[in-house]
C-alpha cells in the first residue's frame, strides 16, 4: 500500500494498492469510491487534432490524444514501450510510481504512470471517474514529474525542467515556462543589480524587482518562440536529488509558485542551486514576483495558501520553515516579504509535504521523522520585523550546515589584511553560527511511525481536525488541541 495524497479540500485520498492499481477513498464518510487498473486500461480511439473537445468525449466516451512537441508514435515505438517495462530497474520507476492529481471532489483526475515504461511516463490521462472513461490523453516530449490543477488551470512539470500551463476548461495550452532560460535571464538580472551598486542604475529595490520581473517575462516568452543558445544542457530531474518544485493555489486566482535556479557564483560558474522562487499568475499568464534566496540550501518543499497570498518553504535540511507574502496583494511591500519563521527542529529531516489550512491559520509539516508538526500562523510572537527580510538572507541554524558546503563565504586568506574588514568577517561568522532561539516551535504535533510515509490533509468542513494517511494502510482523524500539545486521535480506519 502506498498513500499518494489528499485532494485540494481533503475530501478524498488517493492510494496505490499495487504498482498498477489506484483507489480513491472518501474521507467522510470513509469508504472507497473509485478504482482503476492502469495496466489493463486502454484508450479506444485517437485523434491528433491538437485540442481536446469535452463534449465529444462525453457523448462518445472516446479518448483524444494531444501531442506537445512530439510526433505521433509508431508501432515500433509501441513495441519499444513494452520493452521498457522489462528494462526499468532503477529505484525511481521499478515500483510503479504514479503522478496523480484530483480536481477537488469532482469526477476528473489526471494520471501519469511512470512505472509502465519510459514512454508511458510521458503520457498524461484525464479520466472521468463516474463514466470510467478517458476524456483525453496528452503526450509530452519528456517524462512527467508533477501535475497540479484547480478549476481554472492545469500545470505540468517535466523532467526537462519545463512547465506547461493549460486552460482546464478546454485543455488548451497557454504557456510553456522553461526554467533553464529563466536561469539565464536571472544572470542578466543580476548584472542590473551589480550595475546599481556602481551607480549605473538607481539602487531602489522596487525598481530592481521590476527589472527582474520584466526579464522573467521576456525569457518566458522566448521559451515559447524558440530556444536560447545560452541554455545549458538539461538535467534529468526525475533522478536528481535537486529538482524543481511547484504548487498552485486552489482559488480561481490560480497563483503558481515554482522554484528557480539561482545565478552561478563567481567561483563556481557551473553551479546549480534552487534557492529562489518565482510567483506566476497563470490566469493572466504573467509573472508576479521573484523571491531571491529564500533559504541557504536548496528549496525542497513548497505550499501555497488557498488564495495564493502566502507561500511556505523549506530547504533540503528541513530545520527551518518560512512563510512569505507572494506579492499578489496591491499593498505588498518587497522589503517585508518574509512573514513568519518557524523552527521544526535541530535534526536534519527530508520534508516532503507542507500544507496550509483553508483559513490560513495553520501549517502542517510532514517529513521522514516520527513527528508531524502543526504551526500556528496567527501567533504574534513569531512575527518578524520588516528589515530582517530586506536582503533575502536571515540568520538561521542552516547557515552552520550550509557554510560547510558553500565556500562562497570565503576564508580569512581571501580577505585583505585590514583590521576593520577582518573584524567584520569574524563577527558575521560567529553570528551565523549561533542558532536563532527566538523562532517559534510547533503549536501541536502528531506522533507517527517513522518507517511509514504519511501525508496530511486539512478538511475544509472540519477546521479543528486534521487527516493523516500512512503507507501502512491506516487513515486517522485527529482533533487539534485548543492549547499547545499533542493532537488527540478520534477515529481510525483502514484502506482495504
Swiss-Prot record:
Subcellular location: Cytoplasm; Vacuole membrane
Location of Phosphothreonine modifications: 213
Entry keywords, A to Z: Autophagy, Cytoplasm, Membrane, Phosphoprotein, Protein transport, Repeat, Transport, Vacuole, WD repeat
One Pfam family it belongs to: PROPPIN
GO biological process, one term: autophagy
Domain of life: Eukaryota
In-chain residues carrying the UniProt-annotated modification Phosphoserine: 237
Bias-annotated ranges (Low complexity): 46-57
Region of interest: Disordered: 41-86
Motif (L/FRRG motif): 342-346
Family listed: Belongs to the WD repeat PROPPIN family.
Function, in words: Required for cytoplasm to vacuole transport (Cvt) vesicles formation and mitophagy. Involved in binding of phosphatidylethanolamine to ATG8 and in recruitment of ATG8 and ATG5 to the pre-autophagosomal structure. Protects ATG8 from ARG4-mediated cleavage. Essential for maturation of proaminopeptidase I.
PANTHER family: WD-REPEAT PROTEIN INTERACTING WITH PHOSPHOINOSIDES WIPI -RELATED
Name under which the protein is recorded: Autophagy-related protein 21
Organism annotation: Saccharomyces cerevisiae (strain YJM789)
